[in-house]
Amino acid sequence: QAIGKVREPEKLGNGVRLTISAPDLGLDQVGIGESIAVNGACMTVVEKGDDWFRIDVSAESLSKTAGLDTFGPVNLEKAMRLGDRVDGHLVSGHVDGIGQVVSLEQVAESYKLVILAPRKLAPCIAYKGSIAVNGVSLTINEVEDTSVGPRFSINLIPHTMEVTTLHFLKAQSLVNLEVDLIARYVQRNMELREGDDIL
């Protein structure tokens, strides 16, 4: 929905408190205690002003996500409400793993983003399937299984590059990944079936 900027990271116990400027997000519609996804990670608003808000990020969240404890631009999205239009796929804000950018290069008028994902996500990453990268809903174009995890590519149109932080990515950048919700439940169902003791 908008790009914000982390401007004041502060230590908070083993975690961190972040102040994020968000002049284009429409914070007048967000209350204290409501959720905003920051680079794909669902966070709770603890304070807010007209064009900024604060979140507390626990040590657990820091260990499971990338890029939430440093200065810089972040993708922001308010929680969807019943009746809102759905574009892309449903994203919950629960990060499933951290990926590493292999490359980002321009191909004709679009861009090809290649990411190496953790091995545990391999069953949920499929050709033409959906995945969220730093909170951006995208479609997987190619998948290659490697010994260290699935390597997949995504085609990015110029508009996506303009309105998200993905254009800041480069080789070795770390990104938050959230697999498709349906794929997650299918994987869980398969695991239970293999156990033969569901009921």
Give, region by region, the residue ranges found by the protein language model.
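Conserved loop->alpha-helix
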Residues: 1-199
